[in-house]
């Protein structure tokens, strides 16, 4: 994951070294929570467990600073420069598509998938998330609980 696209909070819509990059430009540098969640899930599905966990934990940290509600988009400034996610001036909060992002992040962290009648649980948590639980998951398997815990040095 390059620092050009990863702000420390999520994935930018454009790399920071591109000529048109603008960290508060709607499609040219902002971070979109729903895009980042889809990217995290894709990384997880293709075996990039550590990178997916980094994206998920970073976005969940941003959500805490937005009072547990993710906006449509926020500025793509580097996390080390601002220490908090900078609001995009006209972003909707809440935004319908951003509300699903934390759920997909949790799915990526717990490695939840289905295989016919079975729920697959394959957690990969970053050290910043010690324990994660998702209870009473309905499906063809009936209802199940999923648990994950961080292990030092293992993702």
Language-model features and meaning:
Residues 1-31, 64-87, 103-110, 136-145, ...:
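Extended glycan-interaction surfaces of carbohydrate-active proteins
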Residues 7-9, 49-55, 66-72, 111-122:
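Acidic/polar loop patches that form or flank catalytic/metal-binding clefts of enzymes
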Residues 23, 36, 85, 89-90, ...:
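Generic preference for well-ordered secondary structure
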Residues 26, 36, 74, 81, ...:
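A generic alpha-helix propensity feature with a strong bias for hydrophobic helices
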Residues 29-45, 92-107, 154:
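Well-ordered alpha-helical segments within folded domains of soluble proteins
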Residues 30-67:
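Extended amphipathic alpha-helical segments enriched in small hydrophobics
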Residues 43-54, 115-155:
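Beta-rich accessory regions
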Residues 91-133:
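Catalytic cores of secreted or luminal carbohydrate-active enzymes
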């Amino acid at each position: 994951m390059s620092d050009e696209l990863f702000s420390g909070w999520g994935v930018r819509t454009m790399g920071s070294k591109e000529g048109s990059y603008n960290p508060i430009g709607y499609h040219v540098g902002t971070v979109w929570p729903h895009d980042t969640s889809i990217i995290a899930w894709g990384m997880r599905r293709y075996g990039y467990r550590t990178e997916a966990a980094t994206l998920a934990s970073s976005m969940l940290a941003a959500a805490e600073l937005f009072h547990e509600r993710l906006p449509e988009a926020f500025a793509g400034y580097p996390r080390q420069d601002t220490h908090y996610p900078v609001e995009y001036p006209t972003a909707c909060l809440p935004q319908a598509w951003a509300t699903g992002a934390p759920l997909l992040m949790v799915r990526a962290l717990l490695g939840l998938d289905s295989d016919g009648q079975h729920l697959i649980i394959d957690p990969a948590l970053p050290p910043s998330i010690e324990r994660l639980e998702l209870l009473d998951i309905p499906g063809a398997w009936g209802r199940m609980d999923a648990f994950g815990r961080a292990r030092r040095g293992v993702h």
